[in-house]
């Protein structure tokens, strides 16, 4: 199993907050919003060597969020998967 340092998991939250996002974290899951709506949900799966991002809006994932996640993915040789969840409207 791949071990991700606790500090790196906390650092993801801190970087997103510094970039101006509202972040709620539980273990390896992050709920990211912009104080008006949720933007995405991020799940880190160390065992599978994956970071999965599920976007919750019709817009593309903001570049600063993807850069923060890409940085941690590269550090641990993890695959970054970004998927869109389309609303039923």
Set out the residue ranges of the language-model regions.
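Ser/Thr-rich, low-complexity intrinsically disordered terminal regions
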Residues: 17-18, 22-42
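C-terminal basic regulatory modules in eukaryotic proteins
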Residues: 10, 46-89
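Terminal, regulation- and interaction-focused segments at domain boundaries
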Residues: 1-14, 18-19, 88
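Generic structural signal for short, flexible, solvent-exposed coil/loop and linker residues
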Residues: 10-12, 21, 40, 69
């Amino acid at each position: 199993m791949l071990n991700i340092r606790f500090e790196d998991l906390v650092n993801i939250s801190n970087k997103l907050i510094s970039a101006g996002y509202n972040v709620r974290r539980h273990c390896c899951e992050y709920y990211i919003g912009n104080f008006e709506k949720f933007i995405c949900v991020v799940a880190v799966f160390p065992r599978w060597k994956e970071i999965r991002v599920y976007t919750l809006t019709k817009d593309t994932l903001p570049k600063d969020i993807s850069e923060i996640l890409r940085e941690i993915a590269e550090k641990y040789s993890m695959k970054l998967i970004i998927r869109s969840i389309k609303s039923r409207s």
